[in-house]
Amino acid sequence: MLAVHELEETVIGDLTMFQIDKKTKAEMGHKAVKEILSGLASGESIEQLIFEFDERKTPEAQFAYYCDKLECDIQCKAYDEEGCVDLQHQEKNNTAKNAEVKQLLASGKTWSEMWMTFGQQRYNYDPNFEEVSNFAMQNPITEKGKNK
């Protein structure tokens, strides 16, 4: 499920909630998945895994969903520690224009602290995943971060 859940992004791109509404993204994504997988021997079973992930009703789908969100948190933290985020030049970034995001950044949070805090509030993390996210937020995770 984790290996294939972003297959749609090969067609529609990695669209965020700041770029497109959830319903439209789901419709575009499902159409893209059907097109990509049509005619493949395992196409239907892969399609069902993707749709199961999107619905997040099974324990496996919920686990995969939280893993996906946590991976984004950890990657954001690594980017921050490696100096890949410049908060002074975000004019074209729709995320940085969001009122909640602006408020979190104005409070002095780094980009990754903002992203993780926003994600925890928005995605209603399972307590175990929230604990891992908090650990990543409060501790360096890259060599560069450890040496600061």
Predicted regions span which residues?
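Alpha-helical, largely C-terminal catalytic domains
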Residues: 1-148
